[in-house]
A protein has these predicted regions:
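Periplasmic plug
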Residues: 1-29, 61, 136-138
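Residues embedded in well-ordered regular secondary structure
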Residues: 3-4, 42, 50-150, 186-190, ...
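Short beta-turn/strand-loop junction motif enriched in small, turn-promoting residues
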Residues: 10-12, 28-32, 47-49, 142-144
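Transmembrane beta-barrel strand/turn architecture of Gram-negative outer membrane proteins
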Residues: 21, 39-67, 132-211, 235-251
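Short structured motifs
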Residues: 30, 121-123, 248
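Short clusters of hydrophobic/aromatic residues that line enzyme substrate/ligand-binding pockets
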Residues: 34-35, 113
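Short, charged, surface-exposed loops that flank catalytic or proteolytic processing sites
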Residues: 224
Length: 251
């Protein structure tokens, strides 16, 4: 079972870790004794950062990163592919162009599927206050590419926590958090996974403007054996966008 998150005394979900002031983990009998069945998977108690009396403090951070695919297998070029097909006894279709391999496409499917993925993260936090009011505000945005082309994740959140001393005995505090998440992870099925392209041939092209009936996507010119679906067409035309917006307020 997943743990139960208690954020500033209220059950919720995991907060932005940049906003955490302290964290405590309860498990086993201690968690179930206090929170019942909801705490069966453990309880994580979180206290988030609050405003402090003093001069305005600004904390900013920008991170960049890159992720690159490694140890990809070497794929056959058109000339080597045809040589091995003929050596294995496949018939030389006169319309296939195998007699002149140099005239045929030489598609690098690995380059069309994988990429160097860039990651960006921006964080800004402001804290300050006086005897009357204190506040803590933070905002974060990240934009991530995945190493498979046409897949990504964008997300961001904004949080403000403030406390106002109305009188010596009366205080008003509030915490407001809003955020969003937009991702396209490419969910896979039998014909849509990153290993289909290993079965595609270099003589097949990803795009073909003459193939209007097929949406302009390339197809194998000769056929006669399995060349796999056009994986580039699958990546570009099948999207599984997930968009979430959320808000949480405590007072």
């Amino acid at each position: 079972a997943d743990p139960l998150w208690i954020v500033d005394g209220v059950p919720g979900s995991a907060p932005n870790f940049n906003d955490i002031e302290s964290i405590e983990i309860l498990k086993d009998a201690a968690s179930t004794a206090i929170y019942g069945a909801r705490g069966a998977g453990g309880v994580i108690l979180v206290t988030t950062k609050k405003g402090k009396i003093g001069k305005l403090s600004i904390n900013a951070r920008v991170n960049f990163g890159i992720e690159t695919p490694i140890d990809l297998p070497d794929m056959l070029h058109t000339v080597d592919f045809i040589d091995r097909k003929l050596a294995a006894g496949f018939p030389n279709n006169p319309n296939s162009g195998w007699d002149n391999p140099a005239s045929l496409p030489d598609t690098d499917w690995e380059d069309l599927v994988w990429r160097n993925a860039f990651r960006q993260n921006y964080f800004l936090q402001m804290t300050g206050g006086n005897e009357k009011t204190t506040f803590n505000m933070s905002a974060e945005f990240y934009k991530n590419q995945f190493i498979e082309r046409y897949s990504f994740e964008d997300a961001g959140n904004f949080r403000v926590a403030s406390q106002t001393n109305i009188s010596k005995r009366v205080k008003f505090s509030e915490i407001l958090t809003v955020g969003f998440n937009n991702t396209d992870p490419h969910l896979y099925g039998q014909t849509n996974n990153d290993y289909v392209y290993y079965r595609q041939v270099p003589t097949m092209v990803p795009y073909d403007n003459t193939n209007e009936a097929g949406g302009g996507w390339g197809k194998h010119p000769a056929g006669g054996y399995y060349e796999g679906p056009n994986h580039v067409a699958t990546l570009m035309s099948h999207h599984e966008n997930e968009r979430r917006f959320w808000a949480r307020a405590n007072a």
